Regions:
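Flexible, small-/acidic-enriched active-site or ligand-binding loops
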Residues: 196-222
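A generic structural signal for beta-strand entry/edge sites
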Residues: 152-156, 172, 214
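A short core secondary-structure module
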Residues: 160-200
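Alpha-helical interface subdomain recognition
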Residues: 2-75
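Glycine-rich flavin
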Residues: 43, 47-50, 57-160, 165
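A generic structural signal for well-ordered coil/turn residues at beta-strand boundaries
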Residues: 124, 142-144, 169-171, 185, ...
Length: 222
């Protein structure tokens, strides 16, 4: 783990993730202009990040990750960001979500462990789906139009989202939605990426319809 050495280089007995990031940065920088010109997604960057163990940087050490804190992680992001800002943005979202999972009392343990394990073992990124066509950013307040309904196997979600940073490579979405209960709760629902949207979905949006989504956190609207 690197938490105890967040202010400097890793100890000799620990992997030096700063050095790993620096080793990858040159290649990222060389490819960045072409990705910008063509609008292509840097899939190869994330394969290399995964192979270097950098996708699990903020995964707790108890689950096989590096257990890095925010300060050490910021240094890694800075190195990647200087080489390819787009890659760094997607990576930072992934890191933040794992930091939240590790520290949040509302995250179901079995789900946070599953995502942690997948991030350690392979290419499994996660980010939130929050912004909607009518509401815009939830930072301004308001209830999401995306609705979650109870089923025998979990939750069924229906609604529209505009985007999620890194969506071409995400394995998991954290979908922001409200329940259809008399007193709605608002929370995040863990949904696997790759679900097919109905043909009627409006252009530029994502329709989430998950028959067995898992609710990871919630709060009442009152």
């Amino acid at each position: 783990m690197v938490t105890s050495v967040a202010r400097g280089r890793a100890a000799h007995s620990e992997p030096d993730y700063i050095a790993r990031a620096e080793a990858l940065a040159e290649g990222f920088a060389a490819r960045a202009a072409e990705h910008d010109r063509t609008g292509s997604f840097p899939f190869e960057n994330f394969r290399e990040l995964s192979e270097a163990g950098l996708l699990s940087l903020t995964v707790p050490a108890v689950h096989g990750g590096a257990g890095a804190g925010a300060r050490y992680t910021a240094r890694v992001i800075g190195i990647i960001g200087k080489a390819d800002p787009s890659t760094a943005l997607v990576l930072s979202m992934h890191y933040i979500n794992h930091l939240v999972m590790a520290r949040s009392p509302t995250w179901p343990v079995r789900h946070s462990r599953k995502l942690a394990r997948e991030s350690v073992e392979g290419l499994a990124l996660v980010n939130a789906l929050r912004v909607e066509p009518e509401l815009g950013s939830p930072a301004r307040g308001g209830l999401p139009a995306t609705v979650a309904r109870r089923t025998e196997t979990g939750w069924r979600l229906s609604g529209h989202k505009i985007y999620s940073t890194g969506s071409p490579i995400l394995k998991w979405y954290l979908v922001w939605a409200r329940t259809d209960e008399a007193e709605p709760r608002v929370g995040q629902f863990l949904v696997p990426a790759g679900l097919r949207a109905p043909a009627s979905s409006r252009p530029g949006t994502i329709t989430a319809c998950a028959p067995a989504a898992a609710m990871t956190s919630s709060s009442t609207t009152s």
